[in-house]
């Protein structure tokens, strides 16, 4: 018998920005015997990651390139704005947020969630790229040659 997760749990943004923080904060609060204020040095990563995800999603919608995520195929290939720096700025926002979560709470559980999601998002990107290549062909090949998959100018 297979059970499907509820739709709200299958949603990547809900997992990244709601479920994982609740799990990490709850786990660390129980492990430490009470809530501790997170390390302020890494809180900007949380804000950066979340805002990157949200603002790039809005940018994508406003430039008629589909909805946030690949719930629907983009109507056109965005190659400007944040997409001129990295091919996956929204997914990168998720990962920056999760890294900030792990570091803010010095959480091994948070680090584990981050590592698992690095692998998951990378596999998801490979799948997305195959779909996008099928839709845009040589235009996407040229874009791939110019723009890195994850970290601008590096990776």
Locations of the language-model features?
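Histidine-centered phosphotransfer motif of kinases
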Residues: 85-89
């Amino acid at each position: 018998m297979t059970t499907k997760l509820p739709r709200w749990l299958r949603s990547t943004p809900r997992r990244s920005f709601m479920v994982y923080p609740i799990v990490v904060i709850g786990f660390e609060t129980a492990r430490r015997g009470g809530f501790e204020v997170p390390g302020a040095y890494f809180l900007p990563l949380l804000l950066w990651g979340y805002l990157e995800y949200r603002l790039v999603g809005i940018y994508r919608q406003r430039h008629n390139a589909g909805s946030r995520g690949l719930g629907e195929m983009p109507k056109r290939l965005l190659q400007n704005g944040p997409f001129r720096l990295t091919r996956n700025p929204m997914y990168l926002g998720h990962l920056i947020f999760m890294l900030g979560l792990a570091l803010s709470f010095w959480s091994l559980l948070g680090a584990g969630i981050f590592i698992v999601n690095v692998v998951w998002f990378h596999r998801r990107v490979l799948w997305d790229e195959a779909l996008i290549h099928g839709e845009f062909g040589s235009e996407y090949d040229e874009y791939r040659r110019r723009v890195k998959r994850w970290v601008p100018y590096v990776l």
